[in-house]
């Protein structure tokens, strides 16, 4: 035997039912599935009535809200009857477009009696929850005018929210015309004014937040790993210069001090060279791979071009248009080397002549290797010209046409006409003879 929807046994089987599940079951059983698009939910702030059916827009949107404060302590039977009452309103809205909340006419009574006979429920026109409604009316006002002696309210206004009577109420104009008294608040929840002052006071709220933060900071959720494994590295703060940068800045600000230190160093060329190279490495800036004067794009990979002996030769090589112009600057480079030797720190005795000649010969050999590499790179550059951009390839290399392999070219060193395919071997021989 199937239990009725208001059977007392449900108080033990399902005391706190899911309103959405109840709604779907009642929709299929009593309303022919016509309310599938209607929303049903709890309302935590509604205290004047147990339930309400809201109509939204012109597209047939409707929602049912049930009062959680009024129904949470009531028997399950009251929840079921209230839900069925609001579902009848929703059915009239869906079928007859009836949006009147207070309309309990013949059509409403017909569905109400049909469901009552079928289920044994007692769905009524109005919900009789006056005691619960009055329980939530904590804010009272009393009029000091003649309406104190009039029935049925005797000048009292009781509300669940702290909103004094005003012109927003529909009965305000009639009260001003017949009574004209003022409403004075006579009752409110315990400690309500103190809580309100505490919430409105910004200083106390800030103090409360700070104390709360301190309490949270005092809580230990676990052991800090820094107490177990100490940090042994070197830390750097953001926006703080490192020690090496600070030392470089001090050295740049005091050039006389650097000269004094260099003057008192022992006469060792190796130590001087290492000091010069270390300073050059520290002060050098990182060159971007987008710089076409230093890097070229070869099959998608950046390749660094060979650098010359000094900045002057590098600037000249970046502007040259022929290999002949490259070798014309060799004598100028030798002059620059002799002039640059004067910039090295002088000593009381000076280095030996053999060491000096060995040093210059080493520089010339390095310069020769860089020039040979540069020439070979410029001759082989035409093989990958399709993968290079014309603008990015406008570097120190000279453009050579690879289609003229059987033509003769003039050697830039000795002036002899040589086949272009044998120019590399001939240049190696000429360079060796030229340096010796």
From Swiss-Prot:
Modified how = Autocatalytically cleaved in response to double-stranded DNA-binding: autocatalytic cleavage takes place in trans and leads to inactivation.
Record note on quaternary structure:
Homodimer.
Active-site positions on this chain: 86
Q: What does this protein do?
A: DNA-dependent metalloendopeptidase that mediates the proteolytic cleavage of covalent DNA-protein cross-links (DPCs) during DNA synthesis, thereby playing a key role in maintaining genomic integrity. DPCs are highly toxic DNA lesions that interfere with essential chromatin transactions, such as replication and transcription, and which are induced by reactive agents, such as UV light or formaldehyde. Associates with the DNA replication machinery and specifically removes DPCs during DNA synthesis.
Task: Name all SprT-like domain ranges.
Answer: 19-186
Task: Write out the entry's keywords from A to Z.
Answer: Autocatalytic cleavage, Chromosome, DNA damage, DNA repair, Hydrolase, Isopeptide bond, Metal-binding, Metalloprotease, Nucleus, Protease, Zinc, Zinc-finger
What name does UniProt use for this protein? Answer: DNA-dependent metalloprotease SPRTN
Record-listed Zn(2+) 2 binding positions: 411, 414, 426, 430
Ranges spanned by the short sequence motif SHP-box, renumbered to the chain = 231-239
